[in-house]
C-alpha cells in the first residue's frame, strides 16, 4: 500500500516509538535512504538496524528544514492507556540486539507533537491523546491531525488542545 501511494520517502517523523508508530520506519529508511527524525529511542531503533547515520535525535522546539517543510518537534506526553494509570511500554528502547525487538520492546520513548509549515500552510500532528499544555505555542493551525486513542483516559484532552491550536480543520486519526 505504501509503495503504491508513496514511491519514495525523504524523511520520516516519529512522534514516539511504540511499534504501531515506528515498526516500519527502519525498512522505509533503508529502502529510500530517508532520514528518520525522533527522540533517543528512534535513534536507538535505527542503530539496531545499522542505520544510525540516517537518524536525527531531535531537540525540543527546534525547527528543522526538510525540503520545503519547516518541522518543529513539540514536547508532549502519551495518554495513559493502561486503566488510565500508566503509559503502555513506557521508557526508552533499550534492546542491544534486533532479535530482542518484540512488540513490547518498542517502548514509548520521548513523545512529540509535530508542527509542519509548508507553502503558507500549517499542520499539527498529535499522535497520542495527551499533551503538555504549556508546550503548545503554535496557534491558528490550518489542519490538526488529532490522535484520539486513549482520549477517555486524558482529562479534557479535546477541550484543552483545540483552543490552544485553534485549527481550521480537524482530522481524527
Please identify what each model-predicted range represents.
Residues 16, 24, 71, 128, ...:
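Divalent metal-coordination and catalytic microenvironments
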Residues 10, 129-173:
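Cap/insert and terminal regions of metallo-dependent hydrolase folds
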Residues 1-7, 59-139:
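Core dinuclear metal-dependent hydrolase active-site scaffold
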Residues 53-64, 68-73, 160-173:
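Ligand-binding grooves and catalytic loops that recognize ribose/phosphate and carbohydrate rings
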Residues 18-23, 43-46, 60-64, 80-82, ...:
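Active-site environment of divalent metal-dependent phosphoester hydrolases
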Residues 1-58, 139-145, 166:
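Active-site metal-binding motif and surrounding structural segment of the metallo-beta-lactamase
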